[in-house]
């Protein structure tokens, strides 16, 4: 009997999905079962991942399958591959391996979806059309080439990246995510941001703690960089760190306390300059043989600030007024040279971040820096010179796009006239009035102040230039800081669509059905939650060697402590999983006919809706012990995608789908005329609800450089209304010939030429010399 059954298996044919028959091979079944069991891991007492099951469990299921095949196919002589897979699932459930069954079943479903990409005619056509567009069209004609504003889709490397992006996105949809998530994205119910990076398991963005990175130097993968010894190398390595980390993430890079991190470089530079100046003066005066220069060097090495009383050197110069004067002169020159070097370092930093490329050379890093609160002499020198270098612009006077600088405003530090850094706040306003940057964050906003500890800059909330914010950590209540962490991924909900279906805009009802609205919103949030968790599992399945700079160099806190084969869950759990939304204004118009700037009723409802979303995110955090946050989505590209689909479904609805975009997040619509104060008062309460990130913009007309006081008054209004992060947009013209930046009407105020007119070489030279 046994021999007969063995003979049966030897003659048994397996029918593949394409109808082809192959000889039965039991080892393939064993391998498939083993993969299912291996996908389930447990943690030991040290938190290390170990296999939950052993070979006995695998063998138990395998032998059961073989017996069933022998029993059920004695006469047929053939068996379909789907039947074998059904048997495996059935036996896993029957024997109580529910977790293995779940993973095996989900993997099988994903494999089926991936096959559809290549065997489903409609999907194949759509995929090939996307590839065709990349190869034959310019960025002006093809949306895919414009998806990332920081990538030039018309360059060779930019196009290469877009090819990879298109294939990766389709692979993610067909193989890595459940069908319900990809369908919700394609239908326009949700938008999964940076889907093309999902297969790689990258995280979004990062707040880089440069002090930890600089302490013993770091490696970019092609060589080790020593600990920096002066401000020039500090700024150079800061740019290199940003560039290197950009290659390990799909979002932007931010530095939460740039002034604090650069300050030690200023002190090191000053000590070098001070030693050199004293040596040169003593040498010039033939006094080296009478003064113990080694003692002077030792005293200088003890300094912990560039501000000190020269009398500390009195035991060296004693009663000699001439030598004391040498010390004073050396100090003055050392300060001057240090200040000049710091300016050059900041200038180089700005130029580097606008010229150095990452990601196969297709883009410059999306970089942000937070600064403004370091009151030390060294920190103040960094802040001042960074602002001055921003004010000067790039090589031909262009306004630098990167880094997006964010000036942190804080009472007692820089907000009031008596505050030590008040002069730097004034300078920040002046520079922003000309160059659009810096933006301004407000540490006194209640939701930011809650984390602030005086004297501990690590408790100051840092923002990304794009608005992302990360502070609280439900997984570690003793470490509520920004640095060394980042956002994992975020997905946005099409809020107007839910509102259209349940509001009065379609004239199907006289009053909005809010009960069903909240039910649909809750269901959609649950869907996004599950999608974020699915992506989180992909991220956690990676290893430290997949992200050599982010993890192996310890940019993500404790990443350097991982072993090569460790999974990433214990680190990534400190990041944020973020739900976003778009078009609150259109949602309110769809529900009740007015948006939040038009009526108090609409504002009340708007806060209720976003409050509902925030509360649900907080509940997710408690349920999963992960940082679920709510972001006011930065949706410059997404806003057009959603409304385009909704317009096709519902037609043009006045105030809802009658424009080419949905209004960004909770913003008051740009077309709505209202006062600055009213706009800020309407938007401010939403900052408190969107703990994952937010920003409010104010648009100003005219030349703001001629009225910096008015510009500053808007910043103060932001602070007083409770805004967390704000920016002012205003027109900026630039004369390409003489480089003037400001408002240009008919005649350039600087060189006097009209549009199209030449300007003499002599005048240009005089203007250039005036700027030196």
PLM region spans:
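Well-ordered alpha-helical scaffold segments within catalytic/enzyme domains
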Residues: 586-594
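Charged, amphipathic alpha-helical regulatory modules used
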Residues: 2-134
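Solvent-exposed, amphipathic alpha-helical segments
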Residues: 64, 68-72, 496-504, 590
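Core structural elements
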Residues: 60-61, 87-93, 548-559, 563, ...
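Conserved catalytic cores of very large enzyme subunits
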Residues: 110-573, 594-595, 599-772
């Amino acid at each position: 009997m046994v021999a007969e059954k063995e003979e049966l298996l030897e003659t048994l044919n397996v029918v593949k999905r394409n109808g082809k028959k192959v000889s039965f091979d039991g080892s393939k079944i064993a391998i498939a079962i083993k993969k299912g069991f291996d996908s389930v891991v447990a943690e030991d007492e040290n938190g290390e991942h170990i296999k939950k099951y052993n070979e006995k469990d695998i063998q138990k299921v395998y032998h059961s399958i073989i017996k069933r095949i022998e029993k059920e196919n004695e006469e047929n002589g053939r068996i379909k591959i789907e039947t074998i897979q059904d048997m495996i699932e059935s036996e896993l459930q029957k024997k109580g391996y529910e977790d293995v069954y779940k993973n095996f079943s989900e993997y099988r479903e994903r494999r089926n979806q991936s096959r559809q990409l290549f065997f489903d005619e409609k999907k194949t056509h759509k995929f090939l059309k996307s590839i065709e567009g990349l190869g034959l069209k310019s960025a002006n004609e093809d949306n895919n080439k414009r998806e990332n504003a920081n990538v030039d889709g018309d360059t060779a490397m930019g196009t290469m990246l877009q090819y990879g992006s298109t294939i990766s996105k389709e692979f993610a949809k067909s193989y890595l995510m459940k069908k319900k998530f990809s369908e919700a994205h394609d239908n326009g119910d949700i938008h999964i941001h940076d889907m093309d990076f999902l297969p790689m398991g990258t995280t979004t963005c990062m707040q880089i703690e440069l002090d930890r990175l600089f302490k013993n130097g770091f490696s970019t993968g092609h060589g080790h960089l020593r600990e920096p010894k002066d401000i020039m190398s500090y700024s150079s390595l800061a740019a290199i760190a940003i560039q290197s980390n950009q290659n390990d993430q799909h979002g932007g890079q931010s530095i939460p306390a740039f002034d604090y991190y650069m300050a030690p470089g200023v002190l090191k530079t000053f000590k070098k300059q001070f030693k050199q100046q004293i040596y040169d003066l003593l040498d010039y005066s033939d006094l080296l043989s009478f003064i113990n220069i080694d003692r002077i060097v030792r005293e200088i090495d003890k300094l912990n600030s560039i501000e000190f009383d020269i009398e500390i050197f009195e035991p060296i110069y004693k009663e000699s007024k001439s030598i004391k004067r040498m010390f004073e002169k050396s100090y003055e020159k050392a300060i001057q040279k240090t200040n000049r070097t710091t300016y050059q370092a900041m200038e180089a930093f700005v130029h580097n971040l606008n010229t150095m490329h990452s990601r196969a050379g297709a883009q410059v890093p999306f970089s942000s820096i937070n600064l403004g609160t370091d009151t030390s002499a060294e920190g103040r020198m960094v802040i001042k010179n960074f602002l001055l270098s921003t004010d000067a612009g790039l090589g031909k006077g262009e306004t630098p796009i990167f880094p997006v600088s964010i000036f942190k405003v804080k009472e007692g530090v820089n907000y009031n006239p008596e505050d030590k850094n008040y002069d730097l706040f004034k300078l920040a306003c002046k520079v922003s009035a000309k160059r659009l940057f810096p933006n301004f964050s407000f540490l006194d906003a209640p939701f930011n102040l809650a984390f602030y500890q005086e004297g501990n800059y690590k408790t100051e909330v840092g923002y990304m230039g794009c608005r992302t914010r990360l502070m609280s950590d439900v997984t570690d209540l003793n470490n509520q800081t920004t640095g060394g962490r980042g956002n994992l991924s975020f997905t946005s909900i099409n809020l107007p669509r839910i509102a259209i279906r349940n509001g009065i805009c379609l004239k199907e009802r006289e009053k909005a059905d809010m009960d069903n609205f909240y039910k649909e919103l809750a269901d959609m949030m649950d869907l996004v939650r599950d999608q974020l968790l699915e992506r989180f599992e992909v991220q956690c399945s990676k290893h430290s060697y997949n992200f050599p700079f982010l993890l192996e160099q310890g940019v993500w806190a404790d990443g350097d402590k991982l072993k090569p084969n460790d999974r990433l869950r214990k680190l990534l759990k400190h990041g944020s999983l973020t739900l976003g939304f778009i078009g609150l204004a259109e949602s309110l118009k769809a529900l009740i006919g007015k948006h939040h700037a038009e009526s108090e009723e609409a504002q009340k409802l708007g806060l209720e809706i976003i409050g509902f979303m925030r509360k649900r995110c907080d509940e997710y955090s408690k349920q999963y012990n992960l940082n679920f946050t709510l972001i006011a989505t930065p949706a410059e590209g997404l806003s057009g995608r959603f409304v385009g689909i909704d317009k096709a479904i519902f037609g043009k609805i006045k105030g809802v789908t009658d424009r080419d975009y949905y209004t960004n997040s909770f913003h008051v619509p740009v077309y709505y005329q209202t006062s600055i104060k009213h706009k800020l008062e309407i938007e401010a309460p939403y900052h408190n609800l969107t703990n994952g990130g937010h920003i409010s913009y104010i648009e100003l007309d005219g030349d703001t450089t001629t009225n910096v006081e008015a510009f500053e008054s808007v910043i103060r209004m932001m602070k007083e209304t409770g805004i967390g992060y704000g920016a002012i947009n205003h027109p900026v013209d630039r004369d390409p010939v003489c480089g003037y930046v400001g408002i240009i009407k008919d005649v350039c105020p600087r060189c006097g030429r009209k549009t199209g007119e030449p300007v003499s070489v002599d005048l240009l030279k005089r203007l250039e010399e005036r700027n030196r």
